[in-house]
Curated annotation (Swiss-Prot):
It holds the Pfam family CRISPR_Cas2. Optimum pH is 7-10. Its cofactor is Mg(2+); Mn(2+); Fe(2+); Ni(2+). HAMAP family: Cas2 (MF_01471). This is CRISPR-associated endonuclease Cas2. Keywords: Antiviral defense, Endonuclease, Hydrolase, Magnesium, Metal-binding, Nuclease. Its EC number is 3.1.-.-. Homodimer, forms a heterotetramer with a Cas1 homodimer. The gene is cas2. Mg(2+) binds at D8.
Amino acid sequence: MLVLITYDVQTSSMGGTKRLRKVAKACQNYGQRVQNSVFECIVDSTQLTSLKLELTSLIDEEKDSLRIYRLGNNYKTKVEHIGAKPSIDLEDPLIF
């Protein structure tokens, strides 16, 4: 299923900057950054549970915000991209 992860981490303190880097790194382990603080991730339910647990352990719920949108398996008709940074098909093979 495709999930969209968005987050807002307060970075006015040193701890916030560190949390921001850790949240971004955790999201990169599961998906592709599509904008600042926005990731598209193709995950199954077990991976989503693991990702949620990891992210909630990293953020400060008093200062930070995390949103997870489940777009499901039939997401291709629900996502439209306009403008710079062409879309990447997350299900295509990656060639390095």
